[in-house]
Design a protein with these regions (language model features):
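A short, Lys/Arg-rich alpha-helix, primarily the initiator
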Residues: 1-16
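Short, charged recognition helix plus adjacent turn
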Residues: 9, 34, 41, 63-69
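Residues within the helices of the helix-turn-helix
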Residues: 8, 19, 49
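The alpha-helix within a helix-turn-helix
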Residues: 11, 22, 52
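Short alpha-helical DNA-recognition segment
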Residues: 16-34
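DNA major-groove recognition helix of helix-turn-helix/homeodomain DNA-binding modules
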Residues: 46-61
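Residue at a beta-strand N-cap/secondary-structure junction
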Residues: 15, 42-45
Length: 69
């Protein structure tokens, strides 16, 4: 079972860089990278709100659940 983080896809669709998003939401690029690679242990609701606001998306567009085969 895995949670897949689709931030790269959303950023590409919006022609936005990770650095630009990080700056807009007040997060370091390093911490955003940890989130993008799925290495984050937790995500604050306030961070999700900021990402969704800037990317004009829903939380379910950022994360998806994939079962192991």
């Amino acid at each position: 079972m895995a949670i897949v983080v689709n931030l790269d896809v959303l950023l590409a669709k919006r022609k936005m860089t990770s650095l630009e998003l990080a700056n807009r939401i007040g997060m370091t690029q390093a911490n955003l990278s940890i989130l993008k690679t799925g290495k984050a242990k937790a995500v604050r609701i306030s961070t999700m709100e900021a990402i969704c606001r800037e990317l004009e998306c829903q939380p379910g567009e950022i994360f998806s659940y994939v079962e192991d085969e």
